[in-house]
Amino acid sequence: MSYTASPCPELVEPCAVHAEGMAQEESHRSQAPPTFYHGASQELDLSTKVYKRESGSPYSVLADTKMSKPHLHETEEQPYFREPRAVSDVHTVKEDRENSDDTEEEEEVSYKREQIIVEVNLNNQTLNVSKGEKGVSSQSKETPVLKTSSEEDEEETEEEATDNSSDYGENGRQKKKEKQVERVRVTQRRTRRAASAAAATTSPAPRTTRGRRKSAELPKRKKRATKEAKAPVQKAKCEEKETLTCEKCPRVFNTRWYLEKHMNVTHRRMQICDKCGKKFVLESELSLHQQTDCEKNIQCVSCNKSFKKLWSLHEHIKIVHGYAEKKFACEICEKKFYTMAHVRKHMVAHTKDMPFTCETCGKSFKRSMSLKVHSLQHSGEKPFRCENCDERFQYKYQLRSHMSIHIGHKQFMCQWCGKDFNMKQYFDEHMKTHTGEKPFICEICGKSFTSRPNMKRHRRTHTGEKPYPCDVCGQRFRFSNMLKAHKEKCFRVTSPVNVPPAVQIPLASAPAAPAPAVANTPTSPAPAVSMSPVGAVLPSRPVPHPFSHLHIHTHPHHAHHLPIPPVPHLPPPPALFKSEPLNHRSQSEDTFLRHLAEKNSAAPAQHH
């Protein structure tokens, strides 16, 4: 001990100084919130009760000069002297202040609920205080922090020091009252904490909510145990189910019902090919597959067109030979098609690009297939062959129309006129003649037609195109029927003259002699045979045909119409054989012509 007992007046000044410093430090450490401030003068006068002295005689006090230091350890013990009555007065003040701090008590209760779990009955009595997951009370883990008697004595000495300092001024007295109120509140908090900790240690372990949850979870563990007990039984059943395997395939089933269903659908109803192992639902599909020998392409019965897949054959029969409707239309020209793929191919026709050009004639096409078809005109190739008669055709549609000869009938027949057709395209064009529909209109003159080929044929009258040339003379024509008529005239031979049976026309060879000029003499046309001798030398000088301006009438009633002018628009017919020209006449030919001239000159004299 650094200080000994001394008279009280000698220690008043240092104690007052230290008490004020301590009060300032304590005000910084713990300041009460403004809502819990109460005036000390209104409730009671602490100066008359806490430090009441009956006699004016001085008493001995041990003061610590280190109290003004900020932090004191709780383990330090401070010796002090006090009056026994002063301690009882302090406790009475504490009991009186308990009723005025209800709001502070509510704050402490909420603070405790956040930290620990407290069970309270209806009378606000604490039943249990626990903390942690296993229901162990928090006091068992952490020992309650109780104030020792030395710490309480230290606080009382501080209060006494502040009481002595209040004698020197009213400001010090006011500060003293505020500090005393704060001290009382701190002690109340500590006592409540100590009481709750003691109750937790002494009370028996009650049944908490967590304990109830644990007891409720026990049956679940039993259920898990039962499940674990059933697990080997289920595994044994699964092993039994896995034994249900299909005899024809490696599939495995859990139940017999699934196995029977699999057998009925897959193996009993499905038709399997013996050669390649392919499966078919219908027997007809299997028979059709076997007809192709599992390798050949599937062929159409009507047109013998081959396909690699069955659905392609169905589409072909539906579109070409059957009942399909053109449901897909072009957005630009409104032309209808059977499938959308045909519409896409048709859309190329509306583009201006023509990248495929013929090397022979220079004509351009939009599709490669159109160029291939066009090239057949130059090459003369006939790639399409009939398997029944080995006849070959240049285009596929020609082969299709030819197949009606072997089938014995044509598939499409008109109900109005009875005309039949090989292809549905021609049948549709023919039906428009009965309905009067003419959807194809000429862009130049506005004339309408039943079919597109007819419209293209009509358009040649405006463009002047002549795509049909004659192989003999090279003349070109606008239509194919005009070329056909021209060929008949080109290869036509005039009919022979009716010669009397007594007259013999010698065909033997004779030395060529210059014949007299026969002009303006009506003669009959010569027979269509070669008059020149064999081995005769052909003249190098071409002479015009002598019969180009003659027309002989053998009938007696028309003898007065002898001189008839030649037809101007018809060219002279060419020679049929590679022989000498007809103006190279022999001697027998000259005598025959002279004889005919004399006979014709005598006939008009008899008529008149």
From Swiss-Prot:
SUPFAM superfamilies tied to this protein: beta-beta-alpha zinc fingers
Start and end residues of each stretch annotated as Disordered: 61-232
Alphabetized GO MF terms: DNA binding; zinc ion binding
Entry-linked PROSITE patterns: ZINC_FINGER_C2H2_1, ZINC_FINGER_C2H2_2
Segments of this protein annotated with the region Mediates interaction with CBFA2T3: 497-608
Superkingdom of this protein's organism: Eukaryota
Modified residues (Phosphothreonine): 103
Basic and acidic residues: compositionally biased ranges: 71-97
Acidic residues bias (residue ranges): 98-108, 151-162
Principal location class: nucleus
Any single GO CC term annotated in Swiss-Prot or TrEMBL for this entry: nucleus
ZnF (C2H2-type) intervals: 244-267, 271-293, 298-321, 328-350, 356-378, 384-406, 412-434, 440-462, 468-491
Places the protein is found: Nucleus
Positions carrying Phosphoserine: 57, 100, 196, 203
Chain intervals with Low complexity compositional bias: 194-208
Subunit structure: Interacts with CBFA2T3.
Protein family: Belongs to the krueppel C2H2-type zinc-finger protein family.
Function: Functions as a transcriptional repressor.
Protein's UniProt name: Zinc finger protein 652
Encoding gene (name): Znf652
